[in-house]
Amino acid sequence: MKAKTLTATLALILLAFAQADYDVASYCQLVQSGTKLPSLDSCQNYYTCVSNGLPTLSSCSSGYVFNKDSQQCVPTGSFNCFFGVANPCQNQDKKFVPSAKQCNEWHYCLAGAIAGTGTCKEGQIFNFAKQSCVYGECSNTGNNILDSPNLSVCQIMPNGIYFGDNKNCSTWHKCSGMEEKKGTCPNGDNFDPTYASCVPSNMPACSRIQNPPSTGVVSGPPSTSPCSLGTVVGDLTSCSVYYKCENATRSNSTIWNTYTCSGQFFDVISKQCTSTNQARTLKGCNRCQFTTGSMYWVNAVDPQCSEYFTCSNGLETKSTASTCGAGNFFNEDLQYCMIGNSTVGQYAQTHGACENYTCNPNTRLCNLVTATNTTSSHR
């Protein structure tokens, strides 16, 4: 490797990453149904993209790893994978390997151990096959991977396939090794991931990019005035709208005044505007509000945390929730069902829909089921 290409900082280091996975559902919107994408947590794990459904998580059997390019499990050692490994230099000697942190970093290996680490020049990323830095950008398509690491989209997408863009309807991408090619459909056409090709702009190929509509639909307060002064309740339809019983300005009576949380939901327990994932909302209000794209999933109000809604452009695709099944729970952050529920208590501490609370359907007043509820301590 040429010294002018890499800037080395030699040091003996121990590398142990707890790798966060990325927003798989967003990437699945850019490819054909059935495409498999790698997990960043383990070389054995991968996701299968499903049309109008949650990506499904699978795992290769012992002794095998997932190869994103062949789209199948292959024997360990026949494919170089560096995701979720404690030591990326294992079984590597006198070679450069990619850093699991971000795509423009590399490590130099000696006798299976990290002997040095460095960073490519600005505008370059590390290419393991070429053992050098090549021109490219980390997350340069705008399809940003969530929560570190900052990777190149070509570390996620299979080689040789055309895939879409989540910001421009007419743009397509294609990976060749670590090198990404980008183009635009001619004549104002749009790129349709379903067919992996350009189609006329009048075909419904771009719902993944459309902004969520503002329906303006609300249920109204729970009763006509007068109301009990100081009472604050949520709306049955819009999770961001709430009503406060206040003194009327032109009479001695009380009336319901309407308020709206900006980009947040109304929390029916704390009576405050709260982030959408933390807010405890009325069952039945639109928890898909503020989501973007043609496919996204959110927790439904469910103390077991197994139910979820499918969202499209800020709206629920159906009035009834889907379920992960008994004993499992839906993780809105990772966008898939978690097998087992051993960590659901910890998850519920920051995801209000999974807390155990009840609401009177007539008054809309809500309370935690028990005062010692473990999920209420963070409020």
From Swiss-Prot:
<feature type="disulfide bond">
    <location>
        <begin position="185"/>
        <end position="198"/>
    </location>
</feature>
<feature type="glycosylation site" description="N-linked (GlcNAc...) asparagine">
    <location>
        <position position="150"/>
    </location>
</feature>
<feature type="disulfide bond">
    <location>
        <begin position="120"/>
        <end position="133"/>
    </location>
</feature>
<keyword id="KW-0732">Signal</keyword>
<keyword id="KW-1015">Disulfide bond</keyword>
<dbReference type="InterPro" id="IPR002557">
    <property type="entry name" value="Chitin-bd_dom"/>
</dbReference>
<keyword id="KW-0325">Glycoprotein</keyword>
<keyword id="KW-0677">Repeat</keyword>
<feature type="glycosylation site" description="N-linked (GlcNAc...) asparagine">
    <location>
        <position position="252"/>
    </location>
</feature>
<feature type="signal peptide">
    <location>
        <begin position="1"/>
        <end position="20"/>
    </location>
</feature>
<dbReference type="GO" id="GO:0005576">
    <property type="term" value="C:extracellular region"/>
</dbReference>
<feature type="domain" description="Chitin-binding type-2 4">
    <location>
        <begin position="224"/>
        <end position="283"/>
    </location>
</feature>
<feature type="disulfide bond">
    <location>
        <begin position="60"/>
        <end position="73"/>
    </location>
</feature>
<feature type="domain" description="Chitin-binding type-2 2">
    <location>
        <begin position="86"/>
        <end position="143"/>
    </location>
</feature>
<feature type="glycosylation site" description="N-linked (GlcNAc...) asparagine">
    <location>
        <position position="168"/>
    </location>
</feature>
<dbReference type="GO" id="GO:0008061">
    <property type="term" value="F:chitin binding"/>
</dbReference>
<feature type="glycosylation site" description="N-linked (GlcNAc...) asparagine">
    <location>
        <position position="341"/>
    </location>
</feature>
<feature type="domain" description="Chitin-binding type-2 3">
    <location>
        <begin position="151"/>
        <end position="208"/>
    </location>
</feature>
<dbReference type="Pfam" id="PF01607">
    <property type="entry name" value="CBM_14"/>
</dbReference>
<feature type="domain" description="Chitin-binding type-2 5">
    <location>
        <begin position="285"/>
        <end position="356"/>
    </location>
</feature>
<comment type="function">
    <text>Binds chitin and may bind related oligosaccharide structures.</text>
</comment>
<feature type="glycosylation site" description="N-linked (GlcNAc...) asparagine">
    <location>
        <position position="373"/>
    </location>
</feature>
<feature type="glycosylation site" description="N-linked (GlcNAc...) asparagine">
    <location>
        <position position="247"/>
    </location>
</feature>
<keyword id="KW-0147">Chitin-binding</keyword>
<feature type="disulfide bond">
    <location>
        <begin position="324"/>
        <end position="337"/>
    </location>
</feature>
<feature type="glycosylation site" description="N-linked (GlcNAc...) asparagine">
    <location>
        <position position="356"/>
    </location>
</feature>
<feature type="domain" description="Chitin-binding type-2 1">
    <location>
        <begin position="25"/>
        <end position="83"/>
    </location>
</feature>
<dbReference type="InterPro" id="IPR036508">
    <property type="entry name" value="Chitin-bd_dom_sf"/>
</dbReference>
<protein>
    <recommendedName>
        <fullName>Peritrophin-48</fullName>
    </recommendedName>
</protein>
